Amino acid sequence: MRWGFERKGGGLVINARSETAAEKQLFRESAQLRRCLIPASCYFEWERRADGKVKYAIRPRGKELLYLGGLYTKPEPGALPRFTILTRKAADGISFIHDRMPVIVPKEKEPDWLSQQLTLDELLEAAEADMEFHEAK
């Protein structure tokens, strides 16, 4: 898989707002039929300050492995599928770093997400929100 849905006018869309993905032409079909989980140990976000940017490593509290909710494309013959990461409003404890965060699927909801048993709204309600973070280099 390759990261980023290809935009018709060029460029890549690496993130999709979970609140509107099912309505957007670029993501609609994938939101219904092609869901994926992207494994990670954390994700990184940069806080903008007057004196520059500060990089943070962020993950659910007490977890060493997390799965980001994603969507993927049906590839053309000979091409690799492409994926995008779903995002949501940032959890309260990290919103000072950035106003958005990836949708992190709880372990017990992973099968439901992959089998289309969860709607995007249900996934948002179940998504991990108790986050821990530290400055990263």
List each language-model region with its residue ranges.
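Short linear sequence motif anchored by a di-proline
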Residues: 1-137
